Design a protein with these regions (language model features):
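Structural motif
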Residues: 57-66
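C-terminal binding/interaction regions
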Residues: 2-19, 23-31, 108-191
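Short, structured coil segments at secondary-structure junctions
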Residues: 44, 97-100, 118
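A short beta-strand-loop structural module common to alpha/beta enzyme folds
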Residues: 47-58
Length: 191
């Protein structure tokens, strides 16, 4: 799995908080990987809220990023994990929600940094780019890392959080994506 010429990452010794609730969301491209991650997290003792999608029917990823982000922002979940093919689109969608610090990562070092230094509350990954086992490894590292507050990173986080502007038309609006869903059904969007 790893290039032997490079330093090997430490394997995480899970110290699971059995009360941690993880919200999951994905697009249709990575549903099997998300389902496997859900099973893995449950086996590790996490409570999982799965916001879909649940099959391989073509869908539009922003709505799933939004659902996960809202669950984290309103306290139904402690953290979120979102995935699409590359991780970029769904992570960006999640990050557009007030109170969310989403980090799209490609390795364990980035995942741990995002949690430890920036108190990221949504982890984004590319299911096709990374693959199932590496996703498990990254998710475990993120979930086991603890935020380590410093005066400097508290100031940075405050600045980041102040960027997000409340959008009353967006929050908890089940019809927010109606126009995009109609266009999707008409074939305007494609993979």
């Amino acid at each position: 799995m790893f290039d032997n010429d490079r330093p090997q990452p430490e394997f995480v010794d899970p110290k699971i908080d059995k009360h941690t609730v993880v919200a999951l969301g994905n697009d249709h491209i990575v549903t099997p990987i998300k389902m496997a991650l859900s099973d893995h997290l449950k086996e590790e003792g996490y409570q999982v809220l799965d916001f879909g999608t649940y099959d391989n029917t073509r869908t539009h990823y922003p709505m799933y990023g939004k659902r996960v982000a809202e669950a984290v922002a309103d306290g139904r979940a402690d953290v979120g994990i979102v995935m699409c093919g590359t991780g970029i689109g769904i992570s960006t969608a999640a990050d557009k929600n007030e109170g969310i610090r989403a980090a799209m990562v490609g390795d364990v070092v980035q995942a741990k940094y995002a949690k430890r230094e920036l108190n990221a509350n949504v982890l984004g990954m590319g299911g096709i780019v990374l693959g199932r086992d590496f996703i498990f490894y990254i998710a475990d590292a993120f979930l086991n890392e603890k935020y380590q507050p410093t005066e400097e990173n508290k100031k940075l986080i405050k600045k980041i959080d102040n960027i997000a502007k409340p959008n009353p038309n967006q929050k908890d609006n089940e019809h927010f994506f109606d126009e995009e869903n109609k266009k999707w059904a008409e074939g305007v969007y494609h993979d």
